[in-house]
């Protein structure tokens, strides 16, 4: 009986962390050195497929901002009007359209840090660059230009985070950083959180960008990504409902 259970758990683990491989990848240039990367992957274990859209940028030439959106404006409209180079939907909000967790917009705190099981990290921009920190690592004593609390953590120290849900599949939005000041905003087709963490930690979807940390943003019908091409046209995955805030990237 114990052997049967052991085999069951081994099979479950193999399913959760099946081998994902890149079947195709294309990159295109945007302004200020931002790159849009379109990646298709296949899972050798179960034949599953996933599509990733990434906007890769440098903290040296770009600034990350959190955009409050109390009126429920669409991502594409906001990005075009304010001359952003790329952006995604932001964090969680409640049934009354109020943000859940920390929000710092233009160096002003709109809502405080919240202790909760799901929103375990903070994406922030400071003079030190773009960072993803654990909620317990967050300090209000440093000069912070923008911050949003979200989660769960997907990758830490280039290793996938364990214990993530593997049964619920949905569109996902996420942010990832590496050690040399580069970061990315990302969207992916319907995968579980465990699958997303596994892909980010084990496949080179961002080419030569080595992901050090990654964190989940609001997903499902909220997921959206927008990118301005170098020629002035745009690539866009629209949200399916209004969202409370956005994560955007501007030229410095």
Predicted regions and their residues:
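Extracytoplasmic
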Residues: 49-52, 81-82, 118, 149, ...
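Active-site-adjacent helix-turn-beta-strand microarchitecture at beta-sheet edges
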Residues: 91-166
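Zymogen propeptides
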Residues: 16-114, 186
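Conserved, well-ordered active-site substructure
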Residues: 97-116, 165-173, 177-216, 221-252
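Beta-strand-turn-beta hairpins that frame and shape the catalytic cleft
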Residues: 50, 127-131, 177-184
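N-terminal signal peptide c-region/cleavage motif recognized by signal peptidases
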Residues: 11-13
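Sec-dependent signal peptide recognition
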Residues: 1-8
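Short, surface-exposed charged micro-motifs
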Residues: 54, 122, 174
């Amino acid at each position: 009986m114990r052997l049967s259970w052991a085999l069951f758990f081994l099979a479950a683990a193999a399913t959760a962390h099946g081998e994902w491989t890149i079947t195709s990848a294309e990159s295109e240039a945007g302004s200020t050195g931002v790159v849009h990367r379109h990646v298709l992957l296949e899972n050798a274990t179960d034949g599953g497929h996933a599509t990733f859209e990434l906007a890769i940028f440098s903290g040296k030439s770009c600034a990350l901002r959190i955009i409050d959106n109390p009126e429920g404006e669409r991502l594409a409209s906001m990005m075009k009007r304010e001359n952003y180079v790329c952006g995604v939907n932001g964090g969680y909000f409640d049934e009354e359209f109020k943000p859940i967790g920390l929000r710092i917009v233009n160096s002003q705190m709109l809502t405080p840090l919240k202790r909760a099981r799901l929103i375990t990290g903070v994406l922030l921009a400071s003079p030190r660059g773009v960072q993803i920190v654990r909620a317990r690592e967050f300090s209000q004593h440093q000069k912070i230009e923008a911050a949003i609390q979200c989660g769960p953590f997907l990758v830490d120290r280039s290793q996938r985070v364990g214990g993530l849900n593997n049964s619920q599949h949905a569109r996902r939005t996420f942010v990832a950083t590496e050690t040399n000041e580069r970061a990315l905003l990302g969207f992916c087709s319907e995968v579980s959180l465990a699958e997303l963490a596994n892909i980010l930690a084990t496949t080179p979807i961002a080419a030569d960008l080595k992901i050090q940390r990654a964190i989940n943003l609001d997903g499902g019908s909220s997921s959206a990504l927008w990118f301005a091409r170098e020629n002035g046209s745009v690539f866009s995955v629209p949200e399916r409902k209004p969202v409370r805030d956005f994560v955007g990237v501007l030229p410095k």
